[in-house]
Amino acid sequence: MSKTNFFLKYLKNINNLINNLLEKNLNKLNFKNLSFLFKNNKIILTFVALFIIFISYLILPTFYNPNNISNELKKKLQKKLDLNFKFSQNIEYNFFPKPHFIIRDSKIFGNQKEISKISKLKINISFDNLFSIKDIKVKDVVLEKANFNLNTKNYNFFIELLSKNFKNGKLAIKDSNVFFKHFESEVLFISKIFKMKYYFDSKEFKNFLYSENEIFNMPFSIESFFINKNKIFSQINFDLIKLKIDNELIFDNEKRIGKSKITNNKLKRVVEYQIKKNSFNFDFFDKKAQPKAIYIGKFNLKPFFGSIEGNLDEINLNHLFGSNAVIAQLLKTEIFNNKNINFNLNLNAFNVHNNSNFKNINLNSKIQDGLIDTDNTKFEWRDIADFKLSDSLIFVRNGELVLDGKMKINVNDYNKIYKFLLTPKIYRSQIKQIDFNFSYNFDQKIAELKEIKIDKKINQSVNKILNNVILKKDDLRNKIYFKNLLNDAIKSYAG
């Protein structure tokens, strides 16, 4: 049966329904209540007729030609969002709670390449002009369970959407994933989109983007809008680690120039950066605490490689490895345990914050093949001894951050060590070199020392005493604790 015949039959059924209602109510009439019932039934029948006509109007899109529906919706989405959609034949229409089309398994293309696969695409349409598919107006658009494939060529896909027309309808993206790829099949990282919304604010008279996401198991939110045609502002919040980033990005032909103000608890930093086709370079300033301190970062995307170098007057290790530090929290998420990440860190500092004993710190770290180490990290204890770290590995054990490695200590003046420790003279043996393996838990502040060698010889008594070192919260208590512990080990070594 054709859709036209079906529609005629549907109208006949409506007519029969009205006649049945009339007969049913007229049979109940008597001369006394004739006028009253006539008026009431007239009102009821009018509402029934209007309701049926309204429903009939709403179902008109079900009689559209499927090919015409597909073509017209693609044209209207192209005009509204400047996106090239490809639909399957699985197109559904429903008018509750408002008229809308649902397309299963659709795709978005850009430059003849697939950008996204969408499990469910919902297109809300206006109540106006449902008589013709060409006259319908697209309102809100919702993408659900979509996978976006981005790379160095289309990385600003979501930023470009912010410049589209949302005055007559929103764009929402729900329960989706973003795969950022290095090459065609090499995934660098995946970001989850819980809910994303593009909308027009009539008071501010501009478009806004608000999104709740997750990257490397770390949730964050972002809000963005254009300050002017070539300048966009974004605020990113990582509530888990109390990190906020206020970012301004300027579009200048093929390069992007940006400035970020980073707030972590009470600490404030400034980052100036530049994005080109296959590179990302930045300078990191700590203008208030250390005006001269600067970190220089370079990231190459093809092939992927990154490095950060810094020269500081003073380094605060709590900012790196403290229980609430950003880097420590990021390490716990295992964000860097990715075989596609190749990264080097080199920081030089003259002093350690709140510790006058150590100086000339050279902190080295490397991420390669999914492993993180701090090999070749060096520092000095006054002019008494030099420390060097090797065979190290940073990892997460039961949700806690752990550093394993080997430590080599070259003793420059053993007499000064004994003087510092107030060691009795009868126990002051000559020491030139100390080697040991260790495992340090940053969260519990417990160090486990093994295979301790003094001048290349293992002493079991010393190993037993220094096997478990537990740091205290109070620095003074730590100093007393260390002195007593080391003196016990020295006495045991001297016999």
Regions found by a protein language model. Give the residues of each.
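Hydrophobic residues embedded in beta-strands of well-ordered beta-sheets
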Residues: 101, 203-207, 230-232, 256-258, ...
